[in-house]
């Protein structure tokens, strides 16, 4: 079997496993892939694949924190229904804070991270349902707040 075939098979198996929404740790994913015949897989490779495919940790139907893939792979766009996941946007003198639905913060943060410094975003930190955004020196927190509100069509 060629390397590209092996890689394609690994990617298919990886995506299939994540669709099951039952893996709470990278170690569990490694074990499942080894069980499917990918003996050379390790935690480092799984970590890179999770990042590459935009996997996030969210709660499944049993309320367990598990890895899953966003519906559309790659960097999400504002034209997707992400704006519906934003519940509240606020700011103070230092940060812009976004509150999202449960498990949605990492997906929204990924979009914001992709915009980067060109939009005045120095950094983004996301939890399960809360995102902190720090502006660059060239942008005030109020300007960043207004920009983020416009991005998600948030009227407050």
Curated annotation (Swiss-Prot):
The Gene Ontology CC terms held by the record are: cytoplasm
Q: Which Gene3D superfamilies match?
A: 3.30.1360.40, Winged helix-like DNA-binding domain superfamily/Winged helix DNA-binding domain (1.10.10.10)
Superkingdom of origin: Bacteria
Asked if the Swiss-Prot or TrEMBL record annotates the protein with the keyword Amino-acid biosynthesis, the reply is yes
Short name of one Pfam family: Arg_repressor_C
> Record's family?
Belongs to the ArgR family.
Q: Write the protein's name.
A: Arginine repressor
Q: Which organism is it from?
A: Vibrio atlanticus (strain LGP32) (Vibrio splendidus (strain Mel32))
């Amino acid at each position: 079997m060629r390397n590209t075939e092996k890689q394609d098979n690994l990617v298919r198996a990886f995506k299939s496993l994540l669709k099951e929404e039952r893996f709470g740790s990278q170690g569990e994913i490694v074990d499942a892939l080894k069980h499917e015949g990918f003996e050379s897989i390790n935690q480092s490779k799984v970590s890179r694949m999770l990042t590459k495919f935009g996997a996030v940790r969210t709660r499944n139907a049993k309320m367990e924190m598990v890895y899953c893939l966003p519906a559309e792979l790659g960097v999400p766009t504002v034209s997707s229904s992400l704006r519906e996941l934003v519940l509240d946007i606020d700011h103070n003198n230092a940060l812009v804070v976004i509150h999202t639905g449960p498990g949605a913060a990492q997906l929204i943060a990924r979009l914001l991270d992709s915009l980067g410094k060109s939009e005045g975003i120095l950094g983004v930190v996301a939890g399960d349902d809360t995102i902190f955004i720090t502006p660059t020196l060239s942008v005030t927190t109020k300007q960043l707040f207004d920009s983020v509100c416009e991005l998600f069509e948030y009227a407050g």
